[in-house]
Amino acid sequence: MPQPCRRASRVLVTAVAVLSLAPTPVAAQAESSADFVPVTDAMLQDPAPADWLMWRRTLDSWGYSPLDQIDQENVGKLRMVWSRALGRGNQQGTPLAYDGVLYMPNPGDVIQAIDAVTGDLKWEHRRDLPDDLGDYLGGLVTTKRNIAIYANLILDTTGDDYVQALDVATGDVVWETQILDYTVNPALQTAGPIVAGGKVISGRSCRANATADACVITAHDARTGAEIWRRRTIPAPGEPGDETWGGVPFEERKHVGTWMVPSYDPALNLIYMGTSVTSPAPKFMLGGADKAHLYHNSTLALDADTGEISWYYQHLNDHWDLDHPFERLLVDTAVSPDPAAVSWINPRLRPGEVRKVMTGIPGKTGLVYTLDRETG
């Protein structure tokens, strides 16, 4: 049931306005679910300028807003209109904005719907989490970076290793599906999902006290919660990549997580996710320093319909816990790097040719990589 906001929190969500501008308030959310316009795949692929429908706003993970009402000339005139306390815990959440409502993930699996104009709370959902979660998952279990919206649902991954859907009008649970048993194979779900072609795509940080079966990327039907596929990031004996582990027993292969939010190219129907390190990180403690131990510290391009790995690119064979899970930026651009500015250029590259690329700083090394997102 909805409960009052915890006012004791030190964290605030704020709204600001430019005092000298004519007021152009965002329309308030419709009073009934019958008036709500469901969010479609087309809207996710090309959101209206005022909408922020996912963590980085668009499926290509740009994090860019085309709105231009606030500019260099008037930004100094911004003033607070309202503020609202958020829940206690490790706050890394980004709100969604749609139809005059902010949908805000709070620490500890609390989601709020807030009127964007007034700051009034429309509803709040608090998941009833087990008391022993911290024993299995540690202190980061309260962290939540993002949620997703699709149709008339708010979609989320939970601290107790479920994926759930809430009614956008009420916050009531519509469906929930268990992904893992946290007492057997604990995984931190600090990043929420995206929706790609009606499928809820989510990754997680599998713990060192779990098996390789916790290191999975999953897809669920957004409307029903039925699992469609799951993809391990650590190969089992006999699977492609098994030979890169140097004979390490499967039960000792651990910790290749996908703990940030994926990107998606609907034209190629490929999902792009980055992976973390092994546990332990130094490879001489596993199969040998010369072994790749796939698919750690890699970019994975997955078929959105099947979860099959279309291609992978390993950024480095890591020994120092330098994860590479961060957002992958999808860009169509004329690739023409300055040879003096980069350490390596593909000799097959034709300067000035427009390519579909994946770029950005995917890992903790701070290096920029640019890959062909069709082939890797």
Predicted features and spans:
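Blade/loop signatures of beta-propeller domains
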Residues: 30-80, 233-240
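Extracytoplasmic/lumenal domain signature
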Residues: 73-84, 111-138, 150, 154, ...
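Bacterial N-terminal signal peptides
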Residues: 11-23
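Active-site-flanking structural segment that lines cofactor/substrate pockets
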Residues: 70-99
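Repeat-blade elements of multi-bladed beta-propeller folds
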Residues: 52-56, 88-110, 136-163, 188-211, ...
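Signal peptide processing junction and immediate N-terminal pro/mature segment
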Residues: 23-31
